[in-house]
């Protein structure tokens, strides 16, 4: 290829799995990711929002996920997200719920609802406390019982995937997304020697060889880099704000400790003053007693 192409850039991703000419690749990808959870393999899909090269070249490509329906009515959403943000989990859940809801109109029976699957490829780690790269979320109770087997959300964290050997088709796809940009099409490794991977490389080659497509790809990549820079600046600013807030909290805590210490000191001084007054009063009382005894002794009958 004339230029390296990253399949994770959203426009390439959309062409790879969302173009009508690559429908077989989408089917293969869906079976690779969901195969173990499907009652039967997917054999055909209808892409609901197919990739439109003209929209991409005119910089009007705004919907970059892939939505599809199979022959049984099951719904699928596939999306790549290179940058994390605070609201990403809510966006993922909303996207799944919105696609699930879109199956019926007002007044239609709930029986028309079919399982809906959302697959997200993530460029950055979203779940740092979990060592696994693949996560499956379904509607289950605390004992693991499924409330309704109507699909779910699959997250694939590419930053955690580091398998050297390919053992499953899912791993083959993830390795492709992670490494395809650095591969030499004239010396592809063994794990790339499948019809699906060669077709996927042909899609990347089309972006590399067509000058107008490559310039548009570069513009999209530059936009994503700018977004990443803005995100990093925002995170730095947020970290500074958090540090300032923590410093202010520490200062307030120190002031509170100082105030409490002063209160304790004043209380101690007050106790000491009261003790002194009580001691003086007791001393005066004893003096008076002695004086009274002395007077009684002096005036008494011999």
Report residues per predicted region.
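Short, charged alpha-helical interaction segments and adjacent helix-coil junctions
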Residues: 76-81, 175-302
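Conserved single-residue anchors adjacent to enzymatic active/cofactor-binding motifs
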Residues: 1-209
């Amino acid at each position: 290829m004339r230029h390296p192409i990253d399949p994770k850039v959203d426009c390439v991703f959309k062409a790879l799995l969302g173009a009508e000419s690559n429908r077989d690749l989408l089917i293969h990808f869906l079976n690779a990711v969901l195969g173990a959870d499907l009652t039967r393999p997917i054999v055909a899909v209808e892409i609901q929002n197919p990739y439109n090269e003209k929209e991409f070249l005119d910089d009007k490509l705004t919907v970059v996920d892939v939505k599809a329906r199979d022959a049984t009515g099951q719904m699928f959403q596939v999306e790549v997200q290179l940058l994390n943000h605070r609201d990403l989990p809510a966006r993922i859940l909303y996207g799944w719920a919105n696609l699930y809801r879109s199956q019926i109109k007002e007044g239609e029976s709930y029986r028309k609802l079919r399982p809906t699957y959302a697959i997200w490829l993530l460029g950055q780690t979203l779940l740092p406390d979990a060592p696994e790269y693949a996560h499956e979320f379904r509607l289950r109770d605390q004992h693991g019982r499924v409330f309704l087997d109507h699909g779910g959300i699959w997250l694939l964290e590419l930053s955690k995937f580091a398998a050297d050997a390919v053992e499953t088709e899912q791993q083959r796809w993830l390795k492709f997304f992670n490494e395809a940009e650095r591969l030499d099409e004239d010396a592809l490794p063994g794990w790339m020697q499948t019809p699906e991977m060669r077709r996927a490389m042909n899609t990347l080659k089309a972006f590399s060889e067509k000058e107008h497509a490559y310039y548009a790809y570069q513009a999209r990549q530059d936009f994503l880099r700018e977004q990443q820079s803005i995100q990093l600046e925002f995170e730095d600013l947020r970290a500074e704000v958090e540090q300032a807030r923590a410093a202010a909290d520490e200062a307030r805590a120190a002031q509170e400790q100082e105030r409490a210490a002063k209160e304790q000191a004043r209380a101690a001084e007050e106790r000491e003053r009261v003790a002194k007054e009580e001691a003086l009063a007791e001393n005066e009382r004893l003096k008076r007693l002695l004086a009274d005894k002395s007077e009684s002794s002096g005036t008494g009958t011999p």
